[in-house]
Amino acid sequence: MKKLQFNVKINAPVSKVYEAMLGLKSKLTYEEWTSLFNPTSTYDGSWNKGSKILFIGTDEKGERGGMVSEIVENIPYQYVSIRHYGLVKDDKEITEGPEVEKWARGFENYSFKDNNGITEIIVDLDATDDFVEYMNQTFPKALEKLKEICEK
């Protein structure tokens, strides 16, 4: 697994950015910025520490797929740590086997820093070799979309 890092500065208070990124006041804000990964991107579950959460979308065949994850840490307005430990395929959760093993135990962490009303988000994530290029191309665009949402 490769460690990747992305960041963006957003001219909005950290509370607004955190709530929009996680879709806490409206899931639509989460779905809007993550639509760059999958136009039907959403989540089922809770952002509470220790909770299971599914990051899901529908593929071109109309089948639901995505990732099975756990919120390892959530310090409101400061830090969120997500551990991916399975996948959703054809609407079924798979948490073991060769497909899962290559990227299971990967983390995706969000750090929020306030600097005089400007919020910096730092995203640290683990990616398998076959996803590095995709993440390097897509994650910055998704963070720019989040910036656009928060600065409205």
List each language-model region with its residue ranges.
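A conserved amphipathic terminal alpha-helix motif
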Residues: 101-104, 120, 126-152
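A solvent-exposed, acidic/Ser-Thr-rich amphipathic alpha-helical stretch
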Residues: 42-53, 62
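Hydrophobic ligand-binding cavity/cleft-lining segments
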Residues: 1-41, 48
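Intrinsic-disorder/low-complexity, polar/charged segments enriched in Ser/Thr/Lys/Arg/Asp/Glu/Gln
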Residues: 3-9, 52, 66, 79, ...
